[in-house]
A protein has these predicted regions:
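Hydrophobic core register within WD40 beta-propeller blades
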Residues: 46, 96, 142-143, 244, ...
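Serine-hydrolase catalytic core recognition
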Residues: 404-730
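Hydrophobic beta-strand positions that form the internal "hydrophobic ladder"
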Residues: 52-55, 105-106, 149, 253, ...
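Bacterial N-terminal signal peptides
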Residues: 10-20
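Short loop/turn segments that connect beta-strands within beta-propeller blades
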Residues: 77-81, 123-126, 225-229, 297-301, ...
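Residue-level detector of Asp-centered blade-edge/turn motifs that repeat once per structural unit
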Residues: 50-51, 100-101, 144-145, 248-249, ...
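Mature N-terminal segment immediately following signal peptide/propeptide cleavage
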Residues: 26-61, 66-67
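A flexible loop/linker signature enriched in serine peptidases of the S9 family
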Residues: 59-72, 87-93, 108-119, 135-140, ...
Length: 730
């Protein structure tokens, strides 16, 4: 399939798509409608060319009539010329990456008859065919000036070592192979048969169990030149090699592996064994040396241990002179990650961010020997430079926004990144190395931004239980008039170890456009404030975090422009748990909407694909700590609920399974509490983020209608057509 036929055509198409807003007539900004969601364009994955003259990036749009998202790779010049589409609109393409000499652009694409997902375009011959690299991913490590990539990949199943777990670990809860039941007639059995603990996944659905001895597929290192169509295996052995990084001269590979280079099957069985034991704080909370950093010649040989360090290492990066390695290290699950540097010859790792509490990401060595990285600092996201002497990092790109995904050219003079704020969807920006001379390179959303009055939010902080500072925001409704009172909806994020932030968010804009204030906070348990803050809710979900949310509600309810009799609450996942918890503890809210809810923790443990969450958060399995699981389950207090509730659930959600919502809905109906229950097909836990566009927008519309009725007295309009059989209202 040919790409866009010529550079001239590319520029013309790009001009029509990107600069059309320049010729649009001025309009009076209006409120967001549901159809506007389909028009938002997202920019991501920037990659600066080695010469620093171009930036490749991924553009994601929504094809409304096809009910799908669409991704393409575009390229912009640093001097501000119109961006050009570089991949065919007939295929899905993303994750661009330049070859070290800048002559090729690699990207991921799903195409018919393809034997893999990696394709490459010759930059010096634009408009030609994309060539496939059937075995190479776009995520490998490439040496400076090199013409090859190295990556970690699981061995083929037919060459993987056999894991004989049943002879060595008879306590594993799986019957012997010769004891497994078989269908009486395979042609008449279309059910599912499971014998493994991992039998379903939110991403993959139901996972079939193997009926034979399991082969253990360890991750080996592979190499492929850009001009080749086949890969070469560089490592052997029965342990996995992770986070590979090739030295600048292409002669050495650094990687992370088990601290004792034990076989993966042994490590896995040890963890299985520990996982079956009752929770023990001394054993389970003690820092362990689970992995270490090794270096080996790219030609092969015995790995040499570079660092023996407590905790886990990742994101290895060589310094430009090849003498040092930087990595992100986390001493233990509930400890903050730090950036460390260690000589390749060995020695003690040096912490280059000191006691800085925030989490680093995307580390890169600069040409001057410093390390650049991105980080969430509360609700902001900034790009920073580490102080190599261990002082506080210095912000290079900051402000009230989210600036992420920094990419630089070979000499470190040009930086590209994506940026979004409360009132601006994501666009591509570039700057000089020091963050100066910032320019916006893309304007995909300019026409929409001029047409729609996106609502901004006022940031505030407050002191909660234990004098802990909490960050929050209050978004004003569309058409705000001084002296008028408005309803407010409290939003509660999932996780709980995630966050709300300073970026554009469709859900907040959706309700603000309906004429409501939107209150959102990052209560204790949120990420972005350090590990101590994040894990302060262990064993205490619904306690001080609930107080944090109610304290914010108290503050906002005292405002003259808030109607404290017309307050609502909404949340999903952890927020779904918290909204049902709130409903059992207070009647201050006039209406509540709960997504992906959790109402009974013992049920959740058995029905979820993520049991490890509560094993850690609640200090063991239900039978280890049944009293805590029961005490924190909203269903135990459902008789207290009086607030009307809308329940939204996805049919294929294997993270927070359907039963939690069914239990709650049935209970509310028996109690006589007004309740609605909406179930979405073909959707998993991520419906509100990556679900089918039509269903995602339908959900946004139902939130408007639900809170519109209970908080504003707006009656729901009659449907345009009768629902088809099998759907609609029952």
């Amino acid at each position: 399939m040919s790409l866009v036929s010529s550079p001239v055509t590319r520029v013309l198409l790009a001009s029509l798509c990107v600069t059309g807003a320049l010729h649009a007539q001025p309009v009076t900004p209006r409120a967001m409608t549901l159809r506007d969601w389909y028009r938002v364009t997202t920019v991501s994955q920037p990659a600066v060319s080695p010469s620093g003259t171009h930036v490749a990036f991924t553009v994601t749009t929504v094809r409304e009539t096809e009910n799908k998202r669409h991704q393409e790779v575009w390229v912009a010049t640093i001097d501000g010329g119109a961006p050009q589409r570089w991949t065919s609109p007939g295929y899905e393409s993303s994750a661009p990456r330049w070859s070290p000499d800048g002559t090729h652009l690699l990207f991921t694409s799903t195409r018919p008859q393809g034997k893999g997902n990696t394709w490459v375009i010759r930059v010096d011959a634009p408009g030609g065919e994309a060539m496939q690299l059937p075995t190479m991913p776009t995520t490998g490590s490439v040496p400076t000036g090199g013409a090859f990539a190295v990556w970690a990949e699981q061995t083929p199943i037919d060459t993987a070592p056999l894991r004989d777990a049943f002879a060595r670990m008879p306590a594993l809860a799986r019957p012997p192979f010769d004891a497994l039941t078989m269908p009486a007639d395979p042609t008449r059995f279309d059910g599912r048969h499971f014998v493994d603990i991992s039998f379903k996944s939110n991403d993959r659905g139901f996972v079939a169990s193997r009926r034979t001895a399991r082969n253990w597929r360890v991750a080996q290192l592979w190499k492929q030149s850009f001009g080749d169509t086949s890969k070469v295996q560089l490592t052997r052995g029965n342990y996995s090699h992770r986070s590979p990084s090739v030295s600048p001269d292409g002669q050495w590979i650094a990687f992370v592996a088990d601290a004792r280079l034990r076989a993966d099957s042994v490590v896995d069985m040890e963890r299985d064994s520990l996982g079956r034991l009752p929770y023990d704080r001394t054993r389970d909370e003690t820092e362990r040396n689970e992995s270490d950093i090794y270096v080996m010649p790219i030609s092969g040989g015995t790995p040499r241990k570079v660092a023996e360090w407590m905790g886990a290492e990742s994101d290895l990066e060589w310094s430009a002179n090849g003498t040092s390695l930087a990595f992100i290290g986390r001493p233990a699950r509930a400890k903050s990650a730090r950036i460390y540097v260690i000589p390749v010859t060995g020695g003690a790792p040096k912490n280059v961010v000191g006691a800085w509490q925030y989490e680093p990401d995307a580390i890169t060595w600069m040409s001057n020997g410093t390390i650049r990285f991105s980080s969430s600092i509360g609700g902001r996201a900034a790009i920073l430079d580490a102080d190599m002497n261990g002082g506080a990092p210095k912000e290079v790109v900051g402000g009230r926004r989210r600036a992420t995904s920094p990419s630089m050219n070979t000499t470190g003079t040009v930086m590209a990144y994506v940026s979004t704020s409360m009132t601006k969807p994501t666009e591509l920006f570039v700057s000089d190395a020091d963050g100066g001379n910032e320019r916006q390179l893309t304007h995909f959303n300019d026409a929409l931004n001029a047409e729609v009055a996106w609502s901004d939010a006022e940031r505030f902080t407050y002191r909660s239980v234990g004098n802990l500072e909490i960050e929050g925001w209050l978004m004003k409704p569309y058409g705000y008039v001084t002296g008028k009172k408005y309803p407010v909806v409290l939003y509660i994020h999932g996780g709980p170890h995630s966050q709300y932030n300073e970026g554009w968010f469709d859900e907040f804009q959706n309700l603000a456009a309906q004429g409501m204030f939107v209150l959102f906070t990052n209560p204790r348990g949120s990420s972005g404030y350090g590990a101590d803050f994040t894990y302060s809710t262990r064993g205490r979900w619904g306690m001080e975090d609930y107080d944090d949310l109610m304290k914010a509600t108290d503050i906002i309810a005292r405002r003259a422009d808030i109607d404290s009799t017309k307050m609502g609450a909404s949340g999903g996942s952890y927020g779904g748990f918290m909204t049902t918890w709130i409903a059992t503890k207070t009647q201050r809210f006039a209406a509540i909407q709960t997504d992906r809810t959790i109402t009974d923790w013992t049920y959740w443990y058995g029905a979820s694909d993520a049991q490890g969450l509560t094993e850690y958060e609640f200090f063991g399995k239900p039978w280890d700590n049944q009293a805590l699981y029961d005490r924190l389950s909203p269903i135990r207090y459902v008789r207290n609920v009086r607030t009307p509730m809308l329940l939204v659930q996805s049919e294929d959600d294997f993270r927070t399974a359907m039963g939690s919502a069914e239990i709650w809905y049935t209970s509310l109906k028996k109690l006589g509490v007004p309740a609605e229950f909406v179930r979405y097909p073909r959707s998993n836990h991520d419906l509100s983020r990556t679900g089918e566009p039509w269903l995602l927008v339908d959900r946004l519309g139902r939130l408007r209608q639900w809170f519109g009725y209970w908080l504003q007295g707006t009656k729901t309009a009659a449907p345009a057509a009768t629902a088809a059989a099998g759907g609609g209202t029952h």
